[in-house]
């Protein structure tokens, strides 16, 4: 029965499908917000007519894309679908908790949308800094609704993380060691640990903000002995691991895609890849204050955070060069998924280089809160995370659905998207270097040309998103079934057929140990 299958589901494949559908839907909402932002900035002068509304749209765009698009698709969608198949587990360790993790998200999303509709909305930016987020500058229920929304999304992610950690550590076949696991499994494991350690700190910070707003506490109010900088420390101690949470599953997916379409049976430097991910996860926790170079820290503090941030480039470089080495000498198949993966490597590297620039505290003091920062993190998110999601989706779509996408359309869609995102975000580096600040709805005429180009790019990206919806419809309408899958010996998720039966590995997988 429909309700029993989808509302009360305890099946990792069905829950993964729910996550993918929810993430796609939220992605449309987030894209709509971003189009509104670029429409406002397409030329000087006012379009929306109100800076508060503009800032509400910017805030909503960030929250929707991070908490309701990237995380549900990467961790909830691909994670749920692939982890049990890749380690030969019959399902997740806690199947009912898995269901709850998903069903906490729609109410959370609803609360976020509600927060935009009451009073004047939450126009604080996704960081929700006090005193702007306090009860004077943002009177009314809006910020409180946003905080509740974050609480629900946070609980969902924490439960999900516990579930993945338990599944990966406990539900492998006895002969399978940690170092026999596919890289995507490793990436989700590291991501889950990051979630488990960082989200409680965010919960503490926003709960204190909630009591500051409603119960007259003064955690972040200097008038009562508090300090708004404390909030920034708490937020960014979560916020920096969060950006690695958004990209690490992408690393895992790209490793699989690059290996598969290079015709290799394993990625180059498996152990290096694993340790690089663990290093990135660890280092991600000790660099948070590089988001706060402008709040007046001591010079030695800034020196430490600059150096520590730059160290992250080393394991990241290990991954990039290992992907290139995996490609080397391979029998390369130019499938759409491979194109997304190669686009990921190229554009993520550019985003990483601008990150190294921003790691220098002296430079960051000039570039902080300019469009240079926006360009940097959209290169790693809008062209890192999103390209990985697109590549993973196209690569594993036959596994999820049993049908194949039209490769010609998929390549056209990649090309349109590639042009669109680059035209959107490359000019923003120039705007930032010229000093155009973030989070303003208008700008001096001198910035017009690059902003117009950027807005043109965003509309091209919108065409690519619509093309993707068309491609998915076309695949289900044409019903081209998968005939044969190559390289299944080293890509075990395909072993049960396309799509796999509702229940897989009902008796444990037999793994022969080579160690």
Curated annotation (Swiss-Prot):
GO CC terms in record: mitochondrial inner membrane; respiratory chain complex IV
Residues that hold heme a3 according to the record: 376
Residue numbers binding Mg(2+): 368-369
Gene3D superfamilies named in the record: Cytochrome c oxidase-like, subunit I domain
Cofactor stoichiometry and binding remark: Binds 2 heme A groups non-covalently per subunit.
Quaternary context: Component of the cytochrome c oxidase (complex IV, CIV), a multisubunit enzyme composed of 14 subunits. The complex is composed of a catalytic core of 3 subunits MT-CO1, MT-CO2 and MT-CO3, encoded in the mitochondrial DNA, and 11 supernumerary subunits COX4I, COX5A, COX5B, COX6A, COX6B, COX6C, COX7A, COX7B, COX7C, COX8 and NDUFA4, which are encoded in the nuclear genome.
Protein name per its UniProtKB record: Cytochrome c oxidase subunit 1
Organism expressing this protein natively: Mammuthus primigenius
